[in-house]
Amino acid sequence: MLDRDGFRPNVGIILLNQRNQVFWGKRIRTHSWQFPQGGIDRGETPEQAMFRELHEEVGLQPCHVRVVARTRDWLRYEVPDRYIRRDARGHYKGQKQIWFLLQLVGHDWDLNLRATNHPEFDAWRWNDYWVPLDVVVEFKRGVYEMALTELARFLPRNDQRNRYLRSGMRQREGAPEVSLGTTTQLRTTSLLVHPGMELPPGASFDPDPRTGDGDPGMPGIHKPAG
């Protein structure tokens, strides 16, 4: 379902944990990481589509999250021709999105990447709020910056670090001022490694997705081999 300009209506989801870190998923069988997102079906409202995509991609139910805010207007990005099926070129232009900021009120183990038979992600991790701007695929970077910037003022005030992020001190024409070397190191108590600890379904510890380095001090999360 495209609008007359060739954009598909879509929702994007920024999911926060209790430290105001964001869910970051690795697309299945690729090296590409992104926020959950998906199309709005005919007859759906953006909020209905958001809750459907939240379950399909992350395995969460409405009771697991609190809706904090949403973007006021559609945010658009164009998809380069090389990513568009040949039969859709000339018709499909990209996505127009309403973005939702959610906070997880459940637990990390409520996340399930295998909630459906057509999973979108095969790995996930928590990242600091602005980190995705440096690691998302280039053609989505502009819409990510618009969404993150518009929704940043709604971040729950429960984290000194995120109060600093909300101060608006940014460098080089809108890029994040926070050090991007501080990608989430899984230091939350719910993800520290302890004997007998159960990870979320399909998850284990792995290298930093930005570098592929197996630095044990910078673990990520991924689906185990086999």
From Swiss-Prot:
The keyword Hydrolase applies. PROSITE patterns: NUDIX, NUDIX_BOX. InterPro entries: Nudix_hydrolase (IPR020476), NUDIX_hydrolase-like_dom_sf (IPR015797), NUDIX_hydrolase_CS (IPR020084), NUDIX_hydrolase_dom (IPR000086), RppH (IPR022927). The keyword Membrane does not apply. Pfam families: NUDIX. Its cofactor is a divalent metal cation. Its EC number is 3.6.1.-. A motif (Nudix box) lies at residues 38-59. GO terms for molecular function: bis(5'-adenosyl)-pentaphosphatase activity; guanosine-3',5'-bis(diphosphate) 3'-diphosphatase activity. Keywords: Hydrolase. Residues 6-149 form the Nudix hydrolase domain. It is an enzyme of class 3 (hydrolase). Residues 197-226 are annotated as: Disordered. GO terms for biological process: nucleoside phosphate metabolic process; ribose phosphate metabolic process. It comes from the Bacteria. Accelerates the degradation of transcripts by removing pyrophosphate from the 5'-end of triphosphorylated RNA, leading to a more labile monophosphorylated state that can stimulate subsequent ribonuclease cleavage. Belongs to the Nudix hydrolase family. RppH subfamily. HAMAP family: Nudix_RppH. This is RNA pyrophosphohydrolase.
